Structures are given as structure tokens and as C-alpha cells.
């Protein structure tokens, strides 16, 4: 299997499977002399870690990260810093239950990558889905924590803005509420509703989709390049690469199709440090290049395909059958996708910042 690496100058390669011994990543291209410890990474991993509420998978993984290379204690300052060499990170798997998947060893789960992996490679890891499992995203979050160090001065935050058909009230958006509920929801009232709503989904053995919004502030104007290195193009590709993501939009996205030219244009006036925009329908990117406004992206996460409802499928021999999935699964995997989305946006911004410096200096 190839294509486990993304990025150009800030490059991330992930490895490992859901039920393997460990998962991990190698971050190449991180500049030297950036202070970095395992604690800097662990905080982000703890936000994504499973088993923290009844609304996520009950798989219990500590997700303790180990830095294997790429750092050393500076001989003069005594601070551990990056050396500019590849940074290898490892996270051990400790709570696999592969026996839960023995009944589906020869059956394809509808809506899952079971069939397509086997169609391509002639083999698939039925134990938790292997590389197609959301377990792989822990490594992205670890890499994203390093990327945040590279883009110091920029702030990347995410929020769950919709579960099923139920959207938050944007007039009640409060970033401080994100850490007060298990949904990363900025709307206090909607978070309470989501608790009751997801309890019903969870108890029925079903699952539901969600929409996540990522906002990056402090992004300077000028990141990205036409035509095939557009910032929004790379953001879309990075977010689409997250397991279970089926749609991405930047700024107003698909809603812009309903607007007139007068409504959609982000008008400008003279500001203290260049143009001051009167709106941000473009999501902080025009012509593939950042405008200096907040970069805004949203992505849709499909419902978890592993549910308790019997479904029609076929087996590996081509016969019709039914499948009933056991194991521990997220009733709404979109919840834990919030820190994953943040990480991917941070990695893309780090990559584009380094590319921008290489092209125009600064």
C-alpha cells in the first residue's frame, strides 16, 4: 500500500493498523530549534482519545505518545528542541478485541472499505478495518501538534456544528463552550440536545453523521499558489483524506450557489494594515491564496458503517448473506473528527508557510 504520505515540505507519513501492535507517524521537514516535548503532543491526543464519554467508542486506549527521534536537549538552554531531522512518533495499541470481528471475516460491511480494499489488494484487515479505521487518525493529531508549533502565531480551532439534521444556532456560538461538553459544540443549548439525541441513536445500535467546522485565525495573506497548489485545494484534499469524510466546503461553500454577485463579494475598505474586508464569504481564500482573514472550512462525516442493525451484503465467495456487526464503535464518529480536522488544517498551513518562505522569503 502506497500513498501514506502527505505534504510537500512539511511531510507526514503515517503507519500502523487498528488492531496492530502500534500506530505512528514520521514528520519530515520540521524546522530545527523548535521546543518540543511529548507533553506538547499529548494534550491534542487526549482530546481525540476514545472512551471519554458514552457518545464515543468504548475502546480504552491511553494514546501515550513516544518521541523516538528528531529532538534533543539543547546543550546551552537545556530545552528539548527539534533538530531538523525526521521526527518519529509511536502510539501503542493496548485494547484490541479482534475476536469481535471474527463473524465478519468473510463478509463485507455495507458502507465500509472492506470490499474496496480487497478489490484493490486481494486482502483486507477485517480486524477493526486496519488502515481504514478511525484509529489511524490519532497519528494525524500527533503530527498536527507539531505543525501547530511551526505555525506559532496562528490559531486553529474546530467545532461540531451539526449532528444529523440538527444544526447549532450560530448566534449562540461561544468558543469557550467547546471544552464544556463531549461534542466540541460551541452552542450550550444544542449540546444538551445532542446528548439526548445521541443517547437514542446509541441505544438503538445505530449511528449518525455530522458536520465539523474548522477556523484558522492569524493566517497571513499570501499562503497558497495558483494553479495547482491552491491553499483551499490542499485543505480540501487533506480534509477529504480523513476517514468517513464525504464532503468539504470552504467559506460559504455550496451555499454560495444561492447568492448573487453582490451578496457573495467580500467588499473592502482601507484598513490600518492593508484592505479591511467587510465580510468573509470566501473563507479567507481567494484565487487559492490566503487573504489574511480567518480561513474557514467545513466537512461532512458520514455515519459509522458498523451498526447493530442486520443488513444485506455479500460474502467473499459472492453469495448473498446478512451481516450484523459487533465490537465497539462510535455512534457519531464526527465528534472525534474535530481534533483530527484541526490537525489536518494545521499541517496544511505549516506546509504552505514553509513553501511560501522558500518561494518569496520571509
Swiss-Prot record:
Reduced FMN (FMNH(2)). It catalyses: 5-O-(1-carboxyvinyl)-3-phosphoshikimate = chorismate + phosphate. It is an enzyme of class 4 (lyase). One of its GO terms (biological process) is aromatic amino acid family biosynthetic process. Keywords: Amino-acid biosynthesis, Aromatic amino acid biosynthesis, FAD, Flavoprotein, FMN, Lyase, NADP. One of its GO terms (molecular function) is chorismate synthase activity. Its EC number is 4.2.3.5. It comes from the Bacteria. FMN binds at residues 131-133, 243-244, 287, 302-306, 328. NADP(+) binds at residues 48, 54. Its cofactor is FMNH2. Pathway: Metabolic intermediate biosynthesis; chorismate biosynthesis; chorismate from D-erythrose 4-phosphate and phosphoenolpyruvate: step 7/7. SUPFAM superfamilies: Chorismate synthase, AroC. CDD domains: Chorismate_synthase. Pfam families: Chorismate_synt. GO terms for cellular component: cytosol. Belongs to the chorismate synthase family. Homotetramer. This reaction introduces a second double bond into the aromatic ring system. HAMAP family: Chorismate_synth (MF_00300). This is Chorismate synthase.
